[in-house]
Amino acid sequence: MTVDARGHRCPVPSLRLRKALEGRAPGVQLTLLATDAMARIDVPFLMRELGGRVVQIDETDGVLSITVETGDALTD
């Protein structure tokens, strides 16, 4: 699944990602697309808070592609 938050400033990308992660089983991967550079900081913080992890961060033509994986805390 891809969460497209291009054109939005933080905290919107993190909020959209959080909503998309709710109720997902552990080990599920999602990718966030964002153009706000703060997502590079906010998303890893969010994933630590939720018990998940950042798998990969790439940037192409000003678009961040951040792949995350759910952890156990998201199903509680």
Question: Which role does the model predict for each range below?
Answer:
Residues 1-3:
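Generic N-terminal amphipathic, Lys/Arg-enriched alpha-helix
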Residues 5-57:
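Amphipathic, hydrophobic secondary-structure cores in small proteins
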Residues 44-76:
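C-terminal structural segments of small proteins and small subunits
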